[in-house]
Swiss-Prot record:
Name the UniProt record assigns to this protein: Gasdermin bGSDM
GO CC annotations, alphabetized: cytoplasm; plasma membrane
Similarity annotation: Belongs to the bacterial gasdermin family.
Keywords for the protein's UniProt record, in alphabetical order: Antiviral defense, Cell inner membrane, Cell membrane, Cytoplasm, Lipoprotein, Membrane, Palmitate, Transmembrane, Transmembrane beta strand
Region ranges (C-terminal region): 245-266
Species whose genome carries this gene: Piscinibacter sakaiensis
Length: 266
């Protein structure tokens, strides 16, 4: 599977509107800018851009800040099975690649929503990426053909989360009170994250190590007239942009969560 279809999900829509591509990265501790190859619907992480441009061509310090508009934005309501699948994937974003036990049977009869909290971003201005590329871009192992066809991209901004909140709701005919549960009897995160009951309807999962990015801003790398171009904005089709012909942030797949593969361990 190369992506998860989530076109109607409220959180994915918020991320897309902010210019972010939702992603599932293979590991934690990664920082932008990084090179990606998008080929036949598969997004593969190549490695750090710094290894493919001259030393000193990129700024020494990343910009960073909070993403208040994304923090606490909820997903659409999910069934119990869909909630289990989403939580299993979302835990990877806070460093839990596999949970020894993830039993959500206590939520039977409820609908579930999720949100990320403590959302921050780190990245560079797209203009800095373009300037570095034109000082000399040499991505070893990527063919001229892939560059010519626009398959090469750079993630210049990553969004991270401190925690994932899971909230339960019912139609009124049933009552859910997670404070009355021994939550450790249902969920075991293998010591890689903390599970805290925040209220009668909300459980929070907080990672202990470095988080994985759960979304990124991408731009496309192309060569034109002996110069490199870095396109972080695009003119999208009718119905997507507020004004016809307006430039919007570059998105690989609207309404989808992209599953990232690693090409190499750098």
């Amino acid at each position: 599977m190369t992506s998860l279809m989530c076109r109607d999900d409220a959180l994915v829509q918020v991320l897309n509107k902010a210019g972010y591509n939702p992603i599932l990265l293979p590991r934690t501790g990664l920082e932008p800018p990084e090179i990606y190859l998008y080929e036949q619907g598969v997004l593969r992480r190549w490695g750090r851009l710094a290894t493919a441009v001259p030393a000193g061509s990129l700024p020494d310090t990343l910009q960073e800040g909070e993403q208040a508009d994304i923090s606490h934005s909820e997903t659409s309501r999910k069934s119990l099975q869909a909630a289990g699948n989403f939580l299993n994937d979302a835990l990877r974003c806070i460093g839990v690649n596999s949970a020894p036990k993830l039993d959500l049977s206590f939520a039977r009869g409820a609908v579930v929503t999720f949100s990320f909290s403590g959302v921050t971003w780190r990245g560079l201005d797209p203009a800095d990426i373009g300037a570095a590329l034109n000082q000399g871009f040499d991505p070893a192992g990527l063919s001229e053909e892939k560059l010519r066809l626009g398959m090469v991209h750079v993630a210049y901004d990553y969004a991270y989360a401190d925690a994932i909140d899971m909230t339960l709701a019912t139609d009124g005919s049933a009552k859910v009170d997670v404070q009355a549960l021994n939550i450790n009897g249902f969920i075991d995160l293998g010591g890689k994250a903390e599970c805290e009951v925040k209220s009668s309807t909300t459980i929070s999962f907080k990672g202990k190590g470095k988080p994985a990015a759960f979304a990124c801003k991408l731009g496309q790398v192309k060569r034109a007239k002996n110069r490199w171009t870095f396109n972080a904005r695009e003119v999208v089709g009718q119905g997507f942009a507020p004004e016809e012909g307006a430039a919007e942030p570059y998105l690989l797949r609207r309404g989808q969560v992209l599953i990232v593969e690693d090409m190499q361990a750098t």
